[in-house]
């Protein structure tokens, strides 16, 4: 199956090359467009299948290192990422998105179609973007080259798009003067020169006023390839003034003169236009007929300088259909009509297929003292029509393998190891000198339950677990096509239960033992649920039909008994309600003393539309105009969710108390809209008297593609929490009634967002006021913090059992290629200020989840759009991530 997928995708990608013309940077009829900030925007691959586009600017890298946590840049690509970000070794949560699988998949499709993809720096938000020193400028460029340029052997920093390489960088600087950008551009040029076999490009998007306050210095002192002027923000020089001279003077002629006297004298000059009437302020939009008059005039007047048209932005063009074609198509037709020597294309048909990379499976255990990630690329792909949203748990980052470290203890240890392989999964052998129970529920690869961790491009296997006492191991497996459980051997009684819900097929491996063995394998294909009978009387195993729900719960039950548990096992899938799926695994063991039964009950679900976060509202298509609400709810209820329980049965020598540390999040309102706050609190209780709980639910979820969501109401408000109803005026385009569940007091709680910041950036020229066009000097850079080792692993004593359950939850629709948060890791990147492609410090390439549970970032940057009206912020309400740590 893997080889056939590889063959199919290789054929599909190869077919793209002859169907699209080769990119010609010297052409006068190129069409550039911005993408990444459109409301409810389609995937990048959709626009790459449009033959009208030649250059696509992905926006934005919008947080600059001198003003950003950890001195890392940050990014925002609208709805195309899952919200996960990188965290440094110092524990600093950065703003650099790590879960942008769709973009990583789609860029190669664009490049195969002959299009150039540039990464845009800037945008209109946040307004504090600036560079404080020459060293900071060099280090900023070095970081971006290491993270998004060609894969360098010495680079130890993040790779948000994996091994995918962008074709260059765009500067859309909107704030705080032009200091440092010439240095950045010249640093990029030095890196470009180190890769002579590939052509990279630099572009800039100044306002039409001369000189532009932000980019004139960079254009004059560094060589850019493309200059697309925003002819829609300033009335005095806008493109509309070419049509109506009473508005001002269209100054394309003046810009040609400026370029000829600068380091960018060979740059192509583009006319920047809004792609619809709503993409900029009123009065700046030009009809196709008006554009044709302008293009024919200046293409004929400056045939060596005129480069084409730039549009803000892709979604606005897509929504502006004229005679059945998007605005971009009309612009391309105009350019080709006016160009006396247009480029030759062999065909206009581009297959609309979207490959999804699939890593090769791994069936061997890889013992390691820490989680290890190694780069061994072996990508494969499968085609999925881009016109239909498809939810998939297929890993999308090729070439990594992960392994969990071995666990050894003299006391009972419960281990849960999610495994998400590309096409197959295998659990590691579990051996013990005492009783061993193993339960391995298998969930199909097509499942989109929000409880399924997505580990991009990982062939994963768990390492052996050995113990001198009882060992309970639960290994949820999410395979692409098939799943199998590994042998379980023991010198004592062994009970094994493997409920399997396969995508295509499932098989159970042999279970061997020198004593009695109980084994049952209920297979649940689709929604038809058979039941099975275990080999040993006294136990039972059954499965009932599982129905998805929008209320995920996580429950851990520990039962302590003074007498040995019966030598039988029970595994069942229980219908909690008419719309809830429950996976239950019970693993009894028989140590010499009192037995311990660990029962992990996980209720996870997804609605019929596979939603995984609740969208309260979305920004409009203008990137800067007034916000319009397209999916707002009149009433929203949010509350924290975390459930834990423990019971003690039988006589014990001393009372049993349980200390529970609950880490939970709740939704609050800040001056800009919704915000997610993470809090931690501790409670100690006797299982026989009460339990520690924190429950939550979201009521009245919005309707999705499959219909309205079912309404669920929480039975009670958790102790220590209170419910409040308020009117939020900044959460959507219209006032919205919001029901919030908030903690009564924050006393004793710790916010996980409060992390110590590393040392501030160093370097000369702090906060300069005058721009400088000096070339980089190769200083030491602004990232000066020293590498910090990963946090120490929690030590488990012989009298303590620790079970950790992490269940990311949300109710927003999953998009093909995205997933939930990633496994934990640590990163520390200190790029060198010297353009050598090397980086000091160490980091892991595996992103970790953010401290907030953001599922798909909303557009925050307006970039090359109008700067007069308010920003168009899409609002996303996300439900909670629960991390409960139970200590007995």
Curated annotation (Swiss-Prot):
- Give the CDD domains listed for this entry: GH18_hevamine_XipI_class_III
Asked if the keyword Phosphoprotein belongs to this entry, the reply reads: no
Here the segments flagged for biased composition (Low complexity) are 344-617
Biological process (GO) annotations held by this record are: autolysis; chitin catabolic process; polysaccharide catabolic process
| Disordered, as annotated region | 338-631, 743-799, 813-855
Name the catalysed reactions: Random endo-hydrolysis of N-acetyl-beta-D-glucosaminide (1->4)-beta-linkages in chitin and chitodextrins
- Removed propeptide positions: 864-888
The record places domain GH18 at 29-338
User: Active-site residues?
Assistant: 174 (proton donor)
Question: Where is this chain glycosylated?
Answer: 622, 780
Tell me which GO cellular component terms the UniProt record holds: extracellular region; plasma membrane; side of membrane
Keywords attached to this Swiss-Prot or TrEMBL record, sorted alphabetically, are: Carbohydrate metabolism, Cell membrane, Cell wall, Chitin degradation, Chitin-binding, Glycoprotein, Glycosidase, GPI-anchor, Hydrolase, Lipoprotein, Membrane, Polysaccharide degradation, Secreted, Signal
In this UniProt entry, which residues carry a covalently attached lipid of the kind GPI-anchor amidated glycine? 863
Pfam families of this UniProt entry?
Glyco_hydro_18 (PF00704)
Give the compositionally biased regions (Polar residues): 764-775, 835-855
Q: Where does this polypeptide localize?
A: Cell membrane; Secreted, Cell wall
Tell me which PANTHER family the record gives.
ENDOCHITINASE, ENDOCHITINASE A
Q: Which family does it belong to?
A: Belongs to the glycosyl hydrolase 18 family. Chitinase class III subfamily.
The protein's name: Endochitinase A1
Q: Which organism is the protein's source?
A: Aspergillus fumigatus (strain ATCC MYA-4609 / CBS 101355 / FGSC A1100 / Af293) (Neosartorya fumigata)
- Identify the coding gene: chiA1
């Amino acid at each position: 199956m893997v080889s056939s997928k590889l063959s199919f995708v290789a054929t599909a990608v190869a077919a793209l090359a002859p169907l699209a013309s080769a990119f010609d940077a010297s052409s006068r009829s190129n069409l550039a467009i911005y993408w990444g900030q459109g409301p409810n925007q389609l995937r990048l691959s959709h626009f790459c299948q449009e033959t009208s586009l030649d250059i696509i600017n992905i926006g934005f890298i919008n947080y600059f290192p001198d003003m950003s946590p950890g001195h890392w840049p940050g990014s925002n690509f609208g709805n195309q990422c899952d919200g996960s970000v990188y965290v440094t070794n110092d524990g600093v949560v950065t703003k650099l998105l790590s879960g942008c699988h769709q973009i990583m998949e789609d860029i190669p499709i664009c490049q195969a179609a002959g299009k150039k993809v540039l990464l845009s720096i800037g945008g209109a938000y946040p307004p504090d973007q600036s560079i404080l020193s020459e060293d900071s400028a060099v280090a900023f460029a070095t970081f971006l080259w290491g993270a998004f340029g060609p894969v360098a052997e010495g680079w130890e920093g993040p790779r948000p798009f994996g091994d995918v390489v962008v074709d260059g960088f765009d500067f859309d600087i909107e704030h705080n003067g032009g200091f440092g950008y010439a240095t950045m551009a010249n640093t990029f040029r030095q890196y470009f020169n180190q890769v002579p076999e590939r052509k990279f490009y630099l572009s800039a998007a100044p306002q039409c006023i001369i000189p532009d306050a932000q980019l004139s210095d960079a254009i004059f002192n560094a060589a850019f390839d493309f200059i697309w002027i925003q002819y829609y923000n300033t009335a005095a020089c806008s493109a509309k003034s070419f049509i109506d001279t009473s508005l001002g003077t269209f100054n394309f002629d003046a810009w040609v003169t400026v370029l000829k006297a600068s380091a960018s004298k060979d740059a192509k000059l583009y006319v920047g236009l809004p792609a619809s009437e709503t993409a900029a302020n009123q009065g700046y939009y030009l009809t196709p007929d008006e554009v044709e008059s302008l293009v024919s005039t200046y293409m004929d007047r400056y045939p060596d300088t005129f480069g084409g048209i730039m549009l803000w932005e892709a979604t606005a063009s897509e929504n502006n259909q004229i005679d059945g074609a998007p605005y971009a198509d009309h612009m391309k037709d105009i350019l080709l009509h006016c160009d006396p020597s247009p480029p030759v294309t062999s065909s206009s048909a581009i297959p609309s297929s979207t490959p999804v990379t699939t890593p090769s499976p791994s069936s061997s255990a890889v013992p390691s003292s820490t989680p290890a990630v190694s780069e061994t690329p072996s990508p494969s792909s499968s085609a999925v029509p881009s016109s239909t949203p498809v939810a998939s748990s297929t890993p999308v980052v090729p070439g990594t393998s992960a392994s969990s470290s071995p666990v050894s203890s003299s006391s009972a240890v419960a281990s849960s190891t999610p495994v998400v392989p590309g096409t197959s999964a295998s659990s590691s052998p579990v051996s013990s000198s005492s009783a061993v129970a193993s339960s391995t529920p298998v969930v199909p690869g097509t499942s989109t339950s929000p409880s399924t961790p997505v580990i991009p491009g990982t062939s994963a296997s768990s390492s052996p677990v050995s113990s001198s006492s009882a060992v309970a191991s639960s290994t949820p497996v999410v395979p692409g096509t098939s799943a199998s459980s590994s042998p379980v051997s023991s010198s004592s009684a062994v009970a094994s239960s493997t409920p399997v819900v396969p995508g295509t097929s499932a098989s159970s491996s042999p279970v061997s033992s020198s004593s009695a063995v109980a084994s049952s394998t209920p297979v649940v294909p689709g929604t038809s649920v058979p039941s099975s009978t275990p080999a040993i009387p006294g136990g039972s195993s059954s499965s009932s039909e599982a129905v998805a729900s929008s209320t995920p719960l996580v429950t851990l039950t520990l039962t302590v008994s003074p007498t040995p548990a019966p030598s039988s096992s029970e595994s069942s899938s229980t219908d909690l309600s008419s719309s809830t799926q429950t996976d239950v695994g019970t693993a009894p063991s028989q140590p010499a003393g009192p037995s311990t039964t660990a029962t992990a009950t996980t209720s996870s679900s997804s609605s019929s539309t596979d939603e995984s976060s609740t969208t309260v509202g979305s920004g409009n298509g203008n990137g800067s105009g007034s916000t319009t609400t397209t999916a707002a709810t009149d009433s929203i209820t949010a509350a924290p969710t975390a459930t834990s329980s423990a019971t003690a049965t039988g006589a014990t020598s001393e009372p049993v108390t349980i200390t529970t540390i609950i880490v939970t999040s709740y939704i609050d309102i800040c001056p800009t809209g919704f915000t997610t706050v993470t809090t931690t609190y501790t409670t100690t209780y006797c299982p026989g008297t009460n339990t520690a709980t924190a429950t939550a639910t979201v009521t009245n979820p919005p309707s999705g593609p499959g219909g309205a969501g079912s309404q669920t109401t929480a039975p009670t408000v958790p102790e220590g929490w209170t419910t409040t109803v308020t009117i939020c005026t900044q959460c959507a385009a219209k006032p919205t009634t919001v029901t919030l569940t908030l903690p009564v007091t924050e006393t004793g709680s710790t916010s996980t967002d409060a992390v110590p910041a590393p040392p501030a950036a160093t370097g000369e020229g702090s906060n300069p006021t005058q721009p400088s066009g000096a070339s980089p000097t190769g200083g030491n850079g602004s990232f000066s913090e020293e590498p910090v080792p990963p946090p120490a692993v929690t030590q488990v004593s012989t009298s303590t059992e620790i079970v950790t359950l992490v269940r990311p939850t949300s109710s927003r629709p999953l998009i093909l290629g995205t997933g939930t948060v990633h496994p934990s890791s640590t990163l520390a990147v200190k790029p060198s200020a010297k353009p050598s492609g090397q980086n000091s410090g160490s980091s892991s390439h595996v992103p970790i989840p953010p401290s907030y549970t953001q599922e798909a970032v909303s557009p925050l940057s307006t970039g090359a759009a109008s700067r007069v009206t308010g920003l168009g912020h899409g609002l996303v309400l996300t439900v909670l991530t629960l991390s409960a740590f139970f200590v007995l």
